[in-house]
């Protein structure tokens, strides 16, 4: 009897405890239900996961935008017995104009050849170090031919100047496999807009390139290279033969290309004045070596390096 009585008491205690728990949980459950009903759809778990994915994507895009398009590390170039470049390192960002600058004979022409994968035959060339394009070794992984598809070198003069401006640009467009006349016309307009040259070249599309003034001939050469839709545009001494006004116009055209196409524009120049007005970033070469790299305004006015100061002050040419 005593055991049965004890069991009954325990059962009654358990039932009372369960009732108390249920009564205390009901308000909390009701509050959760009301909160859930009032939440907008985007606060759901799936939406939060979606926001997490978006945040990761933005972070990745930010990282990609900060990653240089071209990385040069400890690059050395020997042409036969002559060492043209030695232990060269710098970065090139997309969407900016980078000036490779220095006195004549400093190695910037050879560096532009190396970046454009247009070096002479392999028997005479000995390379060391790394040129990386889009995260891949331009010579060992991509190969020179594939790398040249991503990089456009601007060549001034030549037989193409016998063609009309329209045909010169259209030739590069057709090389990409575009043959529809309407598509070619639209692409020509895109190229001219990228250069801010709708008026300077757009009014002379049917004129021979050779018949144009010096500035317009240079712009036509750049437009022809730009029609290939390159990731990097390489230009050597674009202000040669131009007066101050035309040099400024050329600098603005190069800035426009970088800004509107996100292309990396690389300019090789021994003219400190043109480097100052055209470039966002600069790399200073002396005797085949890089002595300093960084934002052009800093190199121009706040550098502590002797050779950089001497170049921008015009003391070495």
Residue ranges and their predicted role:
Residues 183-203, 211:
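Conserved ABC ATPase "signature" region
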Residues 126-127, 135-152, 175, 299-303:
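ABC ATPase NBD coupling module
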Residues 163-176, 187:
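Q-loop/switch helix immediately C-terminal to the Walker
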Residues 268-270:
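H-loop/switch region of ABC-family ATPase nucleotide-binding domains
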Residues 193, 298-317:
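C-terminal boundary and immediately downstream tail of ABC-type ATPase nucleotide-binding domains
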Residues 288-289:
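Conserved ABC ATPase "signature" C-loop
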Residues 101-103:
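The feature captures the beta-strand-to-loop junction immediately N-terminal to the Walker
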